[in-house]
Design a protein with these regions (language model features):
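N-terminal, polar/charged subdomain of small-to-medium soluble alpha/beta proteins
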Residues: 1-96, 105-115, 119-155
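Short hydrophobic/aromatic beta-strand micro-patches
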Residues: 101-103
């Protein structure tokens, strides 16, 4: 039986994410591995230069969904502890937007649980990303509006 610490760390924050402290938080003497995912702001998206990002969330529901993810990975993988922290607000290029760390006695469980956590977070947690470019902004996974027919024929 794997001993779990009293509490996983599941947070939405508006300041820089301290990834080193989260790695220390999940580490236990019974663990043999920590697997982490560090998602950060890149300087381009779909061939366009990104200036910055803004994240918004439906916070009560987002935290509830993060708790569901943590509960699932505790139930289905042999892990010790998980930290899932997502940043909200304005983020510059290179800043961490989401950090997940999973500790476990063995690396396989930690890898699988971390992968499940980020993939499920992206699909189910109500957090939205708006990308800002020199020529405008778009919500992530959204499409740019189609070019009007008159603009196409003018070119």
């Amino acid at each position: 039986m794997i001993e779990t610490i009293e509490e996983d760390k599941l947070e939405l924050v508006r300041e820089a994410i301290d990834t080193a402290s989260l790695m220390r938080y999940v580490r236990g003497e019974q663990d043999g591995a920590i697997v982490a995912f560090d998602g950060f702001v890149r300087n381009q998206s779909h061939g366009r230069a990104t200036r910055y990002l803004e994240y918004e969330a439906y916070e009560p529901m987002a935290l509830g969904k993060m708790k569901e993810i943590a509960a699932y990975i505790h139930e289905h993988y042999r892990i010790h502890c998980v930290a899932i922290v997502h940043r909200l607000g304005h983020l510059e290029i290179g800043e961490t937007s989401v950090f997940i760390a999973v500790s476990a006695p063995h690396r396989g469980a930690a890898f699988e649980a971390c992968r499940y956590a980020i993939d499920t977070l992206k699909k189910t947690v109500p957090i939205w990303k708006k990308e800002y470019f020199a020529d405008g902004a778009v919500w992530a996974d959204g499409e740019l509006p189609p070019t009007p027919p008159s603009a196409k024929s003018a070119s």
